[in-house]
Structure formats: structure tokens, C-alpha cells
Amino acid sequence: MTMFRSISMVMLLVALVTFISMVSSAASSPEADFVKKTISSHKIVIFSKSYCPYCKKAKSVFRELDQVPYVVELDEREDGWSIQTALGEIVGRRTVPQVFINGKHLGGSDDTVDAYESGELAKLLGVSGNKEAEL
């Protein structure tokens, strides 16, 4: 029984080390580097797919605030699938859209709409959230 337990522990340890090395290598992949560089280089970044209704909704929120996000349309890139995988490893979600403001992850479409409706998005961007108030 002790021998079986020792073998099980060794197998578990090997599996854990393998998993950690896979995650580490993915987190430092060219695609992960692209994601990180893009996020740090632009005030507003949306990782999107051109046909996605949730992505369109998130982009429309920024139009309402007269803001122009930097949009990465994953379906229009040869490396889009790999970028989406790297994005999922970085933020814990593979779904699109994924929105970043000032280098920080805001979330997806619902998170973006909620932040807009609460006024938090306007605060993060340093803009007025009420167009009528600007008149």
C-alpha cells in the first residue's frame, strides 16, 4: 500500500509540474506578449470578433462616450485563435469581448455595459458619462 501511495504521489507531482510549465510557457508565448503589449500601449483595448453581437454591444458603449477603442478583431487574424487562448490564460476567460481600460481588465460585454450604466466607465476614462450634461 505504501509503494502504491508513493507512486501516486510521484505521478501527481509530475502532472503538476507539467501543468505549471505548460501554463508558464503559454503565458510567455509570442501571443501572450502581443496581448500584454497591446493592453499597455492603448487606453482602451477590446479583443473582439467582428460578427459577435456582444462585441458590437461593447464597442457601441464607447461610441456613446465618444471614445475610440483599439480593437483587435481575432477572427480577422491568422493568429486569432492563439491570441484568444493566450488572452484566456491571462484573464481567465476565453470569451469575447474582453475589454481593458488603462491597462486593467474591465471584463466582457455585460461588465462593460454595467460599468457604463453605473458611471464607473466614464470615471475610468475621465470623461462625462452624460452627453446632455456637456451641452
Curated annotation (Swiss-Prot):
PROSITE patterns: GLUTAREDOXIN_1, GLUTAREDOXIN_2
Domain of life: Eukaryota
Main location: cytoplasm
Glutaredoxin domain mapped to chain residues: 32-132
Keyword Cell cycle assigned: no
Keywords on record: Cytoplasm, Disulfide bond, Electron transport, Redox-active center, Transport
Protein localization: Cytoplasm
Gene Ontology CC entries for this record: endoplasmic reticulum; Golgi apparatus; plastid; secretory vesicle; vacuole
Covalent S-S links between cysteines: 52-55
Cross-referenced Pfam families: Glutaredoxin
Family label: Belongs to the glutaredoxin family. CPYC subfamily.
Role played: Has a glutathione-disulfide oxidoreductase activity in the presence of NADPH and glutathione reductase. Reduces low molecular weight disulfides and proteins.
Protein name stated in the entry: Glutaredoxin-C4
Organism: Arabidopsis thaliana
